[in-house]
């Protein structure tokens, strides 16, 4: 069950995506987004950027990963670099490539890079997705890793600038699946989730990331159009129906580090980073 290292660096064919206001509004509603422009479908939320990259990113993972390991896949990290906001009417094109495979003591990490452009070729955003294959062993590491975004201990030792408490609804995963296009049964089928070693269905990691983005934008009192980077590491799953709490530190000019914990105080998002135009 070796990973296909020959696929590293090979781009997928571009995938087209039309940005519709209804899809923006549906995504905002599915993530309990409090920002009015998002709810009205006038401006895409930050994590909405993953939707145009969903198909090409999955294709890039499948190019390197053995099919028999796919049910052991979990989302490890996500990192967005924003060059311009996504708004209704945009015709977008996204391509993705697997760029690295890394063996760890607990499994194998596959790093995928995606880039989304307008119909005219202008760069809209770049993304790095790290997927983790639990329990996979015996793989040679190759290629590159995604950019780092770890929270420095010196930053963690400072006072927080704020903390936001939010609630993940009992039906959150069902509501998120349709507008996101992510129907992975670990988020929808209790029996299936348990069969692959999870405690039950879990919230989509990107949905939890969207919650954290609302928290950071609100506490920073920032215009979401000025967001330049948003990154997290998915540390632990969040069951639906739980409260979560996001603590935020200032880490530089326009930059904030953040960490999200569940109601059991387990850290679910770590090494969070949000960078706004100063």
Predicted regions, residues:
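Catalytic-pocket segment enriched in acidic/His residues
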Residues: 187, 191-253, 258-266
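Hot-dog-fold acyl-thioester-processing enzymes
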Residues: 1-77, 138, 142, 146, ...
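Context-gated lysine
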Residues: 15-16, 165, 228, 236, ...
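HotDog/MaoC-like acyl-thioester-processing domains
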Residues: 1-6, 73-164, 238-241, 247-278
């Amino acid at each position: 069950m070796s990973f296909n290292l020959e696929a590293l660096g090979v781009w997928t064919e571009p995938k087209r995506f039309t940005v519709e206001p209804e899809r923006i509004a549906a995504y905002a509603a599915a993530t309990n987004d409090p920002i009015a422009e998002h709810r009205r479908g006038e401006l895409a939320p930050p994590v909405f950027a993953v939707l145009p990259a969903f198909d090409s990113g999955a294709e890039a993972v499948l190019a390197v990963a053995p099919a028999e390991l796919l049910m052991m896949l979990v989302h490890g990290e996500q990192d967005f670099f924003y060059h311009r906001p996504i708004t209704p009417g945009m015709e977008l094109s996204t391509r993705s490539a697997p760029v690295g495979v890394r063996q760890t003591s607990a499994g194998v990490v596959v790093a995928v890079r995606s880039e989304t452009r307008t119909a005219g070729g202008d760069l809209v955003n770049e993304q790095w997705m790290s997927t983790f294959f639990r329990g996979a062993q015996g793989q040679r590491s190759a290629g590159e890793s995604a950019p780092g975004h770890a929270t420095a201990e010196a930053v963690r030792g400072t006072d927080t600038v704020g903390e936001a408490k939010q609630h993940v609804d009992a039906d959150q995963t069902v509501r998120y699946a349709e507008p996101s296009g992510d129907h992975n049964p670990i988020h929808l089928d209790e029996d299936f989730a348990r069969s692959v070693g999870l405690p039950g269905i879990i919230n989509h990691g990107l949905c939890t990331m969207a919650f954290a983005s609302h928290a950071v934008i609100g506490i920073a009192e920032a215009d979401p159009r000025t967001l330049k980077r948003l990154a997290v590491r998915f540390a632990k799953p969040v069951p639906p129906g739980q409260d979560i709490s996001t603590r935020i530190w200032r880490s530089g000019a326009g930059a904030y580090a953040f960490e999200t914990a569940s109601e059991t105080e387990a850290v679910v998002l770590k090494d969070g980073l949000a960078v706004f135009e100063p």
